[in-house]
């Protein structure tokens, strides 16, 4: 019997073997090509063959200890050899057989076994390690364990740090990439991301407005040329005149200037060491719309009508609303565009911006006529029955309709038709769009109301701006603040303010706060100060920028309430206190400083009560309305912030337990019945 292991391999031997080819081991020398395909099986006991061509043969060798002595003592003993006589080239079939019998180099290399071993070891131990830090997640180590829906486990601090690095969002598993539960993704949201969700509601984009007529030559550019009478005597030519305006043109240019006036009273509101602060009312009036021949064509307007169709507008008030809308439609021209929005317990846009052609006017009348008494609009798909919705949401939608339009007319306006009180109609102070409120509770003659509507639609001044300054003989004063008194009080600026567009003969009131040094002369008389006003606007009829000459206005002598018996002084002081408090509180609300705004409003109300005003006074009622609005806004903000639980160790532990239970339930439902008993193996 042969001892040891036998190894079979292929090699090449020469056809003729010489005695010199016999090696010391008693084996025939192997001579084959140096490019042998299986050279990696060569060992020190298997000698290399010389260069030459030979046939491939299969031989068997027994490596025993006695083989050496036998071959050395008996040189003529025949060798144990097994030859296969084949051709010099192997067939593909033989090659495939050899490749199957021969193991690959990669499978027997130590590096491959090490890599395979490490992979198997990672798969076995990955279920007990954190998928982020790769540390143990065994219980009892004092660290909360988070189990995802895909059954991967993590340390809870690792998950929170990973979410913080991704802006507090963890949408997928860090190991397998599967999506997590919605409550996991939305669990830790900062307060800065909650605020836009409260403010910005899901408002659609209103860019479906009807296109304007685009013609190369605008009809507004034509001016009628007056024909002279043939029988009229021809005047003699007197030469060319340079820049000689006609009397009609000069009168039109003079009438197109903005009128600015100051009130005859000025009240001191604060005084200190070396200075005093007083306020004065300024009234700005736009010029009338020109009615001369060639100037009668007004600028096209984009109008949004906001209709209050709540339950309170039933019966006669609803008919008044319809009649008012018919008057508005009759004053619109073909180039004007109209959109209708109705609101009650909810708001909806009933029609997009459409040109008031014959079809557009007919469609608008049909929408107005189908408004029923209970407040529901048939065929529109919205129920307007109910109470309690603020008009502010409808105004925001109206402003959005004008902001999202694709093509724009040079003038825009919003009409609000309602019977609510003045403090219930919210004016958007930050919007440049003029908002006009039409009270349905006041009976106005139809002809007077038509003139008012026509005046609202006639743009007289576009993009009006004022530059204010103080000129004094004995001391230089300064304008500290300018507040708007038309509509909702708002802070406009200091010296340079912007009033925007104004319709024909529109008048706006401004409250100007001035700070100047005190005159310490022996006479004690205050020096008269002069206010300079520089206006700048665009003429809507010609689209020319106009810069009229500066105006000098004499500021009245400021007086205190104690030194004057004029009731207008005390009224002006109270107006300054309430207006300043409301305007500054809104600036604080925009910065989310609710406590400071509430403190400012309550202190102003206490000061007015101390001055002797009753609760029925307009200033007190305005402050009460602002305090109520502030409390409602603050309540919504607090409710939204408290809806999300603060992230504490206790809440984090509870959240982790809740999510782990959900993951285990889903895992139990998806368990394969054939693997019963292996559900904890986490396949």
Swiss-Prot record:
Tissue specificity statement from the Swiss-Prot or TrEMBL entry: Expressed in root tips and leaf primordia.
Domain VWFA: 302-438
EC class of the enzyme, as a word: transferase
GO MF terms, alphabetically ordered: ubiquitin protein ligase activity; zinc ion binding
EC number: 2.3.2.27
GO terms for biological process, alphabetical: gravitropism; protein ubiquitination; root development
RING-type ZnF: 130-176
Secretion signal span: none
Gene3D superfamilies: von Willebrand factor, type A domain, Zinc/RING finger domain, C3HC4 (zinc finger)
Protein keywords: Metal-binding, Transferase, Ubl conjugation pathway, Zinc, Zinc-finger
Taxonomic superkingdom: Eukaryota
Pfam families hit by this protein: VWA_2 (PF13519), WAV3_C (PF25243), zf-RING_11 (PF17123)
InterPro entries: CLCR, VWF_A, vWFA_dom_sf, Znf_RING, Znf_RING/FYVE/PHD
Reaction catalysis annotation: S-ubiquitinyl-[E2 ubiquitin-conjugating enzyme]-L-cysteine + [acceptor protein]-L-lysine = [E2 ubiquitin-conjugating enzyme]-L-cysteine + N(6)-ubiquitinyl-[acceptor protein]-L-lysine
Function: E3 ubiquitin-protein ligase involved in the regulation of root growth. Acts as a positive regulator of root gravitropism. Possesses E3 protein ligase activity in vitro.
Name of the protein in its database record: E3 ubiquitin-protein ligase WAVH1
Protein encoded by which gene: WAVH1
